[in-house]
């Protein structure tokens, strides 16, 4: 009995010793202690606890709290270093440059007129006026003068290509979007204006390429007849090409800039946007309900793809006063109806207003199709165009039929009509490359004649 009591007391003492050791370990900050033997419990705290409890707060907490603000501060400093917050110390009477240039990336500039910082964008052609001191150049944007660091200026065009020539139809909406993009990219040399509204309230655009104050002018029209809309795509591509190469490309030894600074192009790329829409999509795309319903009535079963007239069945190229209502159709329809009175249509009025405003020296009319050209007499112009296109000469004669050419002839304005592509219109899209290749230099060549 006594031996049994002694044994129980010994076990209790050992157990109390283990509990005391565990309690001591917990009070000294030990959290992870394996429940194995007394030796493991006493050895681990001495080797691991001081390192784990002291290193964690010293290495992680200060670094996390101090590093983040240092990084953001550096970025903020980098952003502001390229932005002149005050007028740079620059003498603006520097070396003349006077040509188009671009910036290598979006950068800040100082607007001298508004006395504030603004941004100039990559992919936009600016008129670089002067190279000044202290690493700055003076550029012009409209009537504004901006100081930009010279190191950011390049004279190689970095504008994105805009006109999509793979588009088989190339609609009025496509042209409208592209005109806006072109004017943004090349606003220093290209201006887009509106001469009026069509019957279905589409804008009648015309563009001025080159020096708007140039004394000589070449006027160009395309897509007077609805189904001839490929000429709009070709013309829009030519406009973009001339803008992209304005300060770098040459035609027969003369820079584009030299030619177009002295002889401007005024182009109406889609004279008949309602008609083009009808030819491409049918009357369903005409927004005005009365016009739409009337189109179905006057069509006479004709496939709308071959539509030539405007939205009320009047042929714009028969609506001029000279020879008005001579021949042609007697009722509204898809072609050759002159209307009730001359110059009755908004599209005709728009053309007349632009011609009277710009007073062109020469006019080029693009139609389709047949690869022929019409002109009143053999001239230096017609001979040059033949050498470039090899389109067959056709003398139009003295009889008038209310066409735009008749209107021009009556005012002694030299003109020539080029019929691109092969019949019938609308010309197949596979003909586009040949049309473009044959005619891409026509306008710059005509302009060069007037230097």
Locations of regions flagged by a protein language model:
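Sec-dependent signal peptide cleavage junction
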Residues: 18-30
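C-terminal accessory segments enriched in acidic
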Residues: 105, 113, 125-127, 164-166, ...
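Long, intrinsically disordered low-complexity tandem-repeat segments
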Residues: 31-74, 79-81, 85-86
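Structural recognition of the beta-strand scaffold that forms the well-ordered cores
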Residues: 193-196, 205-207, 217-221, 231, ...
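Beta-loop motif signature
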Residues: 31-33, 87-136, 140, 151-158
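Short glycine- and acidic-rich boundary segments immediately preceding or forming the N-terminal edge
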Residues: 157-200
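Active-site-adjacent structural elements in enzyme catalytic domains
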Residues: 132-134, 141-144, 149-155, 177-183, ...
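Active-site/substrate-binding loop(s) of hydrolase catalytic cores
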Residues: 229-230, 237-239, 243-374, 378, ...
